[in-house]
């Protein structure tokens, strides 16, 4: 078969397949052109999800009359010269958008340049010019109408989704462009319905709150820089999450980008705080030297190529983790390691025996007594206190401890952000009082995070020998393989496991922090978790997932009645533990109720 040279019309239609995939692609290209033209107001109108009509109007610099026809020639652009190919600062630069759109639709471009006396219009249909340029009524900028998209390539229409889905895709595109270009006003209308209306803003955060209201009141600011690469933006607390990644907005040098490296960095930073099938809210802008990033990868310009992927990933994860560690909990993360030798405060007391002061009461007394000089006498008083009375009259004794040891030391409240426990409700929630608010703590969620963070400090984990080693039967070969593979890692986590036979193991030691647990159930759950984890995950991530499983099963359960000393010790440990504001599944461990809000409920304000 002879080789032939394709005509321009056919070439444009083939090229349009890469640039114009759906109506949202048209909106993206036209709005990017409007942004590059220096517009301050951009209005988009669509009908039937963009299939029948797309109109984009802006107040930008406009196009000169003599350049109107040139704008529809492939690779004709006003934004790029030979010397600028390495430093591409415009959203559009390839000169492919208008000819690609014109090849598959009916398009009319009307524009008035800033210094021009009148506006002019030009029309194309299926890639061919229709008539001559005509005068047009337009005060400033550009007005583009795109009708009957894909009429020239009807096969493409079969691949479009429903009108609702195509409309949502356009909304997503406009939101992305509006987010980073916060200094521009945007309006999007479908038929007679206004879908979006964003006024010009002075900062990314203000626009962010317009686009995603979840950022209002839940935003954490990001600011990280290294080797000329700067990361800025905002993320939401882990409790604000969704089942899709559409609320992760990433930008590179002002350009909306969907990149697996960036999404992966965000997910890694949150992996300790939300389930693996959930995604956080984030809007992040990377400013990278132009010679270290290539945006000329694909005609739709939504992909980039980084020169130093490792550095980008490190900056992203470090910046996010810093922000999360500052905000998760109202207190800063402490650098010191947790005391993993601390016994479990939630074992039920033996009511038949004389009760002696628990390590947690002693620890609580130490907390009260130091470093405040006014509280020095507290530990001395405790030596002569009749702890047996607590067993005989628990309610009265606890009230007495509270009255004499806590309420008399009001000044200590200021040094404890979570205040002091007042009661427990539904055997699940701890009510604590601070000077100007109430704190409500989910005891299981809080203790789960404490145990998890303690287990992660592997070098300080203390083991507890079982009085009677537990023999566990493993019923499948895959389970035994997991034990053999991870035996050493489990030892680092505090488990001493000996393989006895082909299907049996002996558990001799467990982490002391877990206290009294069902060892067999725990080991079976660990094995199940190991078999579920993807082989491609890094070893450290696998270990953390195992630790999360251990922490969940080794934590105090909802429905467990607690004493005041136990509640207060839990609060003190939360104050000293990193990330204690969130459990391992992304739920909050506590909430706050301000006194002013309570007073409003009773109409005192």
From Swiss-Prot:
- What are the UniProt keywords, alphabetically? DNA damage, DNA repair
Chain spans, region Disordered: 334-362
GO biological process entries:
mismatch repair
Q: Which domain of life is it from?
A: Bacteria
User: Which GO-annotated molecular functions does the record name?
Assistant: ATP binding; ATP hydrolysis activity; ATP-dependent DNA damage sensor activity; mismatched DNA binding
- Organism in which the protein naturally occurs: Wolbachia sp. subsp. Drosophila simulans (strain wRi)
Q: Which residues cross the membrane?
A: none
> Entry's InterPro entries?
DNA_mismatch_repair_CS, DNA_mismatch_repair_MutL, DNA_mismatch_S5_2-like, HATPase_C_sf, MutL/Mlh/PMS, MutL/Mlh/Pms-like, MutL_C, MutL_C_dimsub
Specify residue ranges for compositional bias: Basic and acidic residues.
345-358
Q: What is the gene called?
A: mutL
Assigned protein family: Belongs to the DNA mismatch repair MutL/HexB family.
Instruction: Write out the function statement from the record.
Output: This protein is involved in the repair of mismatches in DNA. It is required for dam-dependent methyl-directed DNA mismatch repair. May act as a 'molecular matchmaker', a protein that promotes the formation of a stable complex between two or more DNA-binding proteins in an ATP-dependent manner without itself being part of a final effector complex.
- The protein's name: DNA mismatch repair protein MutL
Any one cellular-component term (Gene Ontology): mismatch repair complex
């Amino acid at each position: 078969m002879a080789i032939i040279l394709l005509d321009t019309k056919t070439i444009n239609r083939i090229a349009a397949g890469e640039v114009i995939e759906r109506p949202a692609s048209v909106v993206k290209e036209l709005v990017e052109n409007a942004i590059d033209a220096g517009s301050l107001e951009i209005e988009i109108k669509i009908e039937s999800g963009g299939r029948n009509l797309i109109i984009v109007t802006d107040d930008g610099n406009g196009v000169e009359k003599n350049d109107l026809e040139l704008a529809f020639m492939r690779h004709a652009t006003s934004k790029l010269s030979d010397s600028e190919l390495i430093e591409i600062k415009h959203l559009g630069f390839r000169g492919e958008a208008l000819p690609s759109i014109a090849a598959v639709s009916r398009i009319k471009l009307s524009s008035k340049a800033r210094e021009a006396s009148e506006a002019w219009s030009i029309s194309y249909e299926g890639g061919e010019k229709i008539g001559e340029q005509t005068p047009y009524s337009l005060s400033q900028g550009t007005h583009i109408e795109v009708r009957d998209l894909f009429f020239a390539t009807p096969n493409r229409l079969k691949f479009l989704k429903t009108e609702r889905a195509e409309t949502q895709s356009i909304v997503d595109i406009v939101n992305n462009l509006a987010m980073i270009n916060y200094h521009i006003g945007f309006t999007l209308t479908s038929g007679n319905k206004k879908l979006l209306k964003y006024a010009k803003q002075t900062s990314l955060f203000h626009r962010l709150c317009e686009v995603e209201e979840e950022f209002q009141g839940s935003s954490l600011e990001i600011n990280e820089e290294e080797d000329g690469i700067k990361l800025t933006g905002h993320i939401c607390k882990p409790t604000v999450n969704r089942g899709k990644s559409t609320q992760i907005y990433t930008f590179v040098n002002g350009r909306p980008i969907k990149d697996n490296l960036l999404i992966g960095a965000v997910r890694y930073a949150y992996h300790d705080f939300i389930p693996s099938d959930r995604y956080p809210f984030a809007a992040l802008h990377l400013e990278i030297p132009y010679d270290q990033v290539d945006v000329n990868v694909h005609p739709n310009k939504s992909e980039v190529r980084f020169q130093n992927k490792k550095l980008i990933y490190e900056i992203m994860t470090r910046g996010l983790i810093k922000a999360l560690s500052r905000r998760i909990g109202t207190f800063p993360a402490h650098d010191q390691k947790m005391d993993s030798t601390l016994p479990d405060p939630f074992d039920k007391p033996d009511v038949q025996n004389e009760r002696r002061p628990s390590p947690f009461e002693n620890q609580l007394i130490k907390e009260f007594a130091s470093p405040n000089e006014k509280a020095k006498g507290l530990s001395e008083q405790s030596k002569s206190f009749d702890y047996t009375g607590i067993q005989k009259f628990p309610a009265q004794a606890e009230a007495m401890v509270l009255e004499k040891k806590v309420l008399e030391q009001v000044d200590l409240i200021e040094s404890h952000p979570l205040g002091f426990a007042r009661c427990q409700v539904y055997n699940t929630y701890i009510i604590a009082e601070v000077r100007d608010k109430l704190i409500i703590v989910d005891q299981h969620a809080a203790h789960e995070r404490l145990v998890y963070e303690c287990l992660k400090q592997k070098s300080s984990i203390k083991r507890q020998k079982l009085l009677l080693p537990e023999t566990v039967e493993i019923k499948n070969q895959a389970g035994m393989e997991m034990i053999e593979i991870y035996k050493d890692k489990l030892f680092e986590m505090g488990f001493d496991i000996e393989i006895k036979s082909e299907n049996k193991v002996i558990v001799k030691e467990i982490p002391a922090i877990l206290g009294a647990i069902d060892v067999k159930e725990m080991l079976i759950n660990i094995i199940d978790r190991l078999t579920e984890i993807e082989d491609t995950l890094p070893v450290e991530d696998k270990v953390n997932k195992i630790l999360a499983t251990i922490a969940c099963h080794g934590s105090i359960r909802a429905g467990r009645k607690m004493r005041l000393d136990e509640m207060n010790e839990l609060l003190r440990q939360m104050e000293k533990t990193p990330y204690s504001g969130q459990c391992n599944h992304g739920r909050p461990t506590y909430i706050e109720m301000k006194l002013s809000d309570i007073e409003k409920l009773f109409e005192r304000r």
